[in-house]
Regions:
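Basic, helix-initiating cap at the start of DNA-binding domains
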Residues: 1-40, 57
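N-terminal intrinsically disordered/low-complexity leader segments
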Residues: 1-12, 71, 76, 119, ...
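Amphipathic alpha-helical segments that line or abut small-molecule/effector binding pockets
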Residues: 19, 86-105, 183-187, 191
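Alpha-helical DNA-contacting segments of helix-turn-helix folds
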Residues: 25, 59-66
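Short hydrophobic/aromatic patch on the recognition helix
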Residues: 42-52
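Amphipathic alpha-helical linker/stalk segments
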Residues: 64-95, 101-102
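Amphipathic alpha-helical packing segments from all-alpha helical-bundle domains
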Residues: 87, 99-109, 116-149, 155-160, ...
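Amphipathic C-terminal alpha-helical segment
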Residues: 98-102, 137, 142-146, 153, ...
Length: 223
């Protein structure tokens, strides 16, 4: 006999089902059955269809949950502001990498090789998603702002560049299997690849300049 679900408000019920479904989707991809998900959630299979309408809608909602940066924003806001700039940024990149790894794992399991389309999203959903992403970037930029005088670019631009680097350096295929650690990403972003000599003027603010000199101002005597 299928278990009878404890009565919950609709949004709480959906959230509980998604919490049970995400690990199964990461492991089995679309091969997972609604019966497996129902058993993991401790509910009757029909409850899934009452909550989401279809398995496809459930999978899409799971992807939307994985892409939701709410937990990322909260984690960034908890980073210790008393840490030095480099250490503070390493923690932020580690948090970002942890989220990216979960997203990549889900997308690989679902055999999705490009950014997913959320067919069931409303314009309000899309606006909220953009707003949340903007808030995540702002939370990261706020971590850098106390030391903005050490940066050659505004914190928002540094976050954008670090974000691009973190994505490509964390993705197992984009990185060619050479995934970088948070420390390596931050050291590259802040200090680049070129040794810095006394009196060296800052490079132009482009991709090459960022790669060679990083985002941080270099004082005399930097090596």
């Amino acid at each position: 006999v299928s278990p009878r679900a404890t009565p919950l408000p609709p949004e709480e019920r959906r959230a509980a089902i998604l919490a049970a479904a995400l690990p199964l989707l990461e492991e089995f991809g679309t091969e997972v059955s609604t019966k497996q998900i129902a058993e993991a959630a401790g509910i009757a299979e029909g409850t899934i269809f009452r909550a989401f309408g279809s398995k496809d809608a459930l999978v899409e909602a799971a992807m939307a949950t994985a892409f939701d940066p709410s937990d990322l924003i909260h984690a960034l806001e908890q980073v210790d502001r008393t840490l030095p700039l480099r250490e503070r940024t390493v923690v932020a990149v580690e948090i970002s990498q942890e989220r990216l790894r979960r997203v990549f794992k889900l997308l690989f399991a679902l055999r999705i090789r490009r950014p997913p389309e959320f067919k069931h999203s409303t314009p309000m959903d899309e606006a909220r998603r953009k707003r949340q992403n903007d808030l995540a970037n702002a939370a990261f930029a706020d971590l850098l702002r106390p030391d903005a005088d050490q940066l050659r670019l505004p914190p928002e631009d540094v976050v954008r560049m670090i974000g691009l680097l973190t994505f490509s350096a964390t993705h197992p295929m984009v990185s060619g299997g050479h995934v970088l650690t948070a420390e390596e990403i931050v050291d590259f972003a802040f200090d680049g690849l070129r040794k810095h000599r006394t009196g060296q003027p800052p490079a132009s603010e482009d991709i090459v300049g960022f790669a060679l000199d990083g985002a941080r101002h270099h004082d005399s005597g930097d090596d």
